[in-house]
Regions:
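Conserved, mostly hydrophobic/aromatic
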Residues: 3, 24, 80, 93, ...
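Glycine-rich phosphate/pyrophosphate-binding beta-alpha loops
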Residues: 11-13, 26, 30-36, 69, ...
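Metal- or metallocofactor-binding catalytic centers and their adjacent structured scaffolds
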Residues: 20-94
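Shared catalytic-loop signature of beta/alpha-barrel
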Residues: 39-40, 47, 52, 59, ...
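Hydrophobic alpha-helical hairpins/lids featuring a short glycine-rich hinge
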Residues: 73-111, 115-127
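Metal-dependent enolase-superfamily TIM-barrel catalytic cores that perform enediolate-based chemistry
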Residues: 107, 112-251
Length: 398
């Protein structure tokens, strides 16, 4: 089997990758929906892929992996890697998890990545109501993650939340940093107290916090929240769109609190997790398969983290339904340090008409049952997808 073409199109504005082979077996990957500019970055690798055997996934990846970097190049390579595994599984007639070593679990736990209920005032009462709605959702979440602090409009909405001037626009946490005020700390703790009054001890609560907090404030927050037994505090210092990790700063926080600290969604490749893991600078790592270099890369990181006593909770909120399929396959094969992955959704809802093969409902009792269809286990309905392609992408499925 040989690769004859590498294609990338915007499907409703979301980048989708297709690997075409000479035997009629296609593979698909998906890039985060927030990156519609990614098409040329993917197509840059076409020359390196054409003529290669896509079932030799690692051989192909060795040709392109070193050309990646922090977003966007790492995102392009990650989507290509997903598509390679999709082809390899289909060619072998087995689900991807079989090629990754087989199932460790029959169901994978998820948490509410793509499902959020809007808030306007970011008060304790609103957080409690939002959390209550998530607990009542049909997915039956056993873990709920809420945005707070610099990872939410709280920094703008709450007067004197921190000593700084919040930017009026921009990615959450990407632009704003500063020293937390006493008022800000008390407000943050009050919001957590309100949410925990709703969840009790039956549903785990995690917080997406930044980045933006300095290490001293991060430690102050973590210690203040120790009585609430949170699952984790995520991306307090770096994360999201910061192109570095700062493991030593995270270690200063992690080693001085019992509240679990989590980061890793922005990191590309295992080598860039090495410092974080070996220094045990956090308690939980959370690579995103759409950014880290793909699903096999994520599995390697999970295993290395497990050797060092760290847990794994992958990121995935913007990975779409193809990314969801990839997350299910790799999470089935992860070691026992796996907690749950952040579950992406189809948005807009027409994605569920385009991506075929997913269970209905997808999530039950906070879990997804691992399916056994070949490859990633999904297919793209080309006819249903046509209306959502740009004019220049109309030949994507030819």
């Amino acid at each position: 089997m040989k690769i004859t073409d590498l294609r990338c199109a915007l499907l409703g504005g979301h980048p989708v990758v297709r690997i075409v082979t000479d035997e009629g077996v296609d593979g698909f990957g998906q890039i985060e929906s927030t990156k519609p500019y990614m098409v040329p970055h993917v197509l840059f690798f076409r020359e390196a892929l054409v003529g290669e055997d896509p079932t030799n996934v690692e051989r192909v990846m060795l040709k392109i992996r070193q050309r990646g970097s922090f977003k966007p190049w790492g995102s392009a390579i990650s989507a290509i890697e997903m598509a390679l595994w999709d082809v390899a599984g289909k060619a072998a007639g087995v689900p991807v998890y079989k090629l990754l070593g087989g199932k460790v679990r029959d169901r994978v736990r998820i948490y509410n990545g793509g499902l959020r209920f809007p808030m306007t005032e970011y008060t304790p009462e609103e957080y409690a109501e939002s959390t209550r709605k998530m607990m009542e959702a049909p997915q039956g979440f056993t873990i709920i993650k809420q945005p707070i602090g610099f990872h939410s409009p709280m920094k703008r909405v709450i007067p004197d939340f921190y000593y700084g001037q919040p930017s009026p626009v921009g990615l959450q946490g990407a632009l704003d940093r500063g020293l937390l005020t006493e008022r800000g700390l008390k407000h943050l703790v009050a919001c957590v107290e309100a949410m925990k009054a709703v969840t009790g001890d039956g549903v785990g609560l995690a917080l997406d916090c930044g980045p933006g907090f300095n290490p001293n404030d991060a430690l102050k927050i973590a210690r203040a929240l120790e009585p609430y037994n949170l699952l984790w505090l995520e991306d307090m210092i770096t994360g999201d769109y910061t192109p570095y990790v700062l493991a030593d700063l995270y270690r200063d926080v992690t080693w001085n609190t019992t509240t679990a600290i989590h980061t890793g969604e922005q990191i590309y490749l295992r080598q860039n997790f090495k410092d974080l893991i070996e220094k045990r600078a956090v308690n939980i790592v959370g690579p995103d398969p759409a950014d880290v270099g793909g699903i096999a890369e994520l599995k390697w990181i999970a295993e290395y983290a497990d050797l060092h006593g760290l847990m794994m909770a992958p990121h995935g909120v913007f990975d779409g339904l193809i990314g969801l399929a990839a997350l299910v396959q790799v999470s089935a094969a992860l070691p026992h340090n796996f907690i749950a992955f952040e579950c992406p959704i189809g948005n807009p809802p027409w994605w569920y008409d385009v991506v075929k093969g997913l269970p209905d409902p997808i999530v039950q009792d906070g879990h997804i049952t691992v399916w056994d269809r070949p490859g990633l286990g999904i297919e793209i309905d080309a006819q249903a997808a046509q209306q959502y392609l740009r004019d220049e992408d109309k030949t994507f499925f030819d």
